[in-house]
């Protein structure tokens, strides 16, 4: 951990902020979760929640809905925060803090942006070892709720 500004340039090194949309629909054993298959590194080919980086000056709640539209072509409504993850080593791109939002959404997803594929998957059928980053931890939370 570095304390204070960079000795060379004087700027602070702050973590990047990302947001992920956690959309669940249905009841009981029929509950489905919206996932994308990543089309780019890191974790290319693995499954993840739709999401991405918050732009400069952008509200994170707006960013999560933008990412949902870009990656799945779906509208949504932010419900609340499920989790915040930020271990410095969790992302190979550097220190990234992610806000996982519960988002109400429905419809047929159409993959776009850096998503190679998007679909609703029965929650109990999600293969945890195929999830990218630490998203399997959020799937476990959902499966146990």
Segments (PLM) and residue ranges:
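NUDIX/MutT-family hydrolases
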Residues: 100-102, 110-144
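A short coil-to-beta-strand element that immediately follows conserved catalytic motifs
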Residues: 74-83
